[in-house]
């Protein structure tokens, strides 16, 4: 029997940040543009780097981080565009998949940065999220991404 938890999930939250100095904010949907990124996102630009177009993170990893650190940091504060539920993201590196109707390719793991550690005011953020900080993906087809979209 196939465990669908590993090959199909859903979009739980969507977040964008207009520039480096602004906080990431939750939105109900976002327009993904092939080769550019997410409309309204600070990294959105012509001929964008493949690995900078959209980022994802698992709510399960966020919950685990909060449990082991004794914190209650909201998912949006993990600075990723899409918070997923019910899908293992690490196994998707090098693969193409869909977020709703938008096709993406996972290029590499999204390693946590020192800015994230400083914003959490936690010593071991980078260590704890090293292999669970999400994915960096390229947008292969344009379209809207909505909360509750299926990831497959």
Spell out what each predicted region is:
Residues 1-152:
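Metal-cofactor-dependent catalytic cores
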